């Protein structure tokens, strides 16, 4: 009797049958949800990857091969398509213009956005919330509504059809998002570190650049990548504000190259130009994708 009593579990440790059934049903539901989610992700990956692989494969074909056997491997790998796109279509010049404009705008917007977000997040002064909401409203302002005022404004300042004018326009439209993204990072930083820097003799500028800004490096990296992707693919602003062909960016050059070859299209060179346009974006995202995901989740929880 004592052995039976010892092996018998207390009533409080035994789960009712209904609870076990609910647990099994929940586990089964989770498995079904995971299976459906993975299937949808695989389908989405196929939809995205297959066209990209087709474009890459077609960039090494001749026009005849692309039209006769679009889904086969190239009979002869035509690397000269990239040379034709780079020189004959001036993709090389447009690529350099895009690098100059985007990198310059990115440096300015990251510096100004970080300073603005830091001041609004760490200092108390009259009108702070008003400035924050005005900057936030810039996220909802459609770009096309500002095209005409921007055109005349840049024309009055002598910045129309110039790289500095396009850079300043890029900065103006990327600044609200940068400030909004970095605001939560600076608010979450410990105030004791800032006070310790002041006690050690650092001024506000030195404390910002040498102490607080390095601590917000994950957020800075993520927002820099998002800004790079948006500015690199920008089309409407340069088309309206940068009509000088020598200063065209890559999106303008690609549109002009695709539309100029109406009847006699060199599809191989066209696909090569597309690859040249897309590769920088893919490289940036593939290299920094973990930092993007980590920074976004970190900023969300903060």
Curated annotation (Swiss-Prot):
UniProt GO BP: transmembrane transport
Protein name: Diacetylchitobiose uptake system permease protein NgcG
The ABC transmembrane type-1 domain, residue ranges: 95-288
Keyword Isomerase: no
Organism: Streptomyces coelicolor (strain ATCC BAA-471 / A3(2) / M145)
Family matches, as Pfam families: BPD_transp_1
Keyword terms of this UniProt record: Cell membrane, Membrane, Sugar transport, Transmembrane, Transmembrane helix, Transport
Segments traversing the membrane: 40-60, 99-119, 131-151, 166-186, 221-241, 268-288
Annotated InterPro entries: MetI-like, MetI-like_sf
Keyword Protein biosynthesis found: no
Gene Ontology terms: cellular component: plasma membrane
Protein location: Cell membrane
Family indicated by similarity: Belongs to the binding-protein-dependent transport system permease family.
Disulphide bridges: none
Superkingdom of this protein's organism: Bacteria
Primary role: Part of the ABC transporter complex NgcEFG-MsiK involved in N,N'-diacetylchitobiose ((GlcNAc)2) uptake. Responsible for the translocation of the substrate across the membrane.
Induction, as annotated: Constitutively expressed. Slightly induced by GlcNAc, (GlcNAc)2 and chitin. Repressed by DasR.
Self-association and partners: The complex is composed of two ATP-binding proteins (MsiK), two transmembrane proteins (NgcF and NgcG) and a solute-binding protein (NgcE).
SUPFAM superfamilies: MetI-like (SSF161098)
Membrane topology: Multi-pass membrane protein
Gene3D superfamilies, per database record: MetI-like
Main location: membrane
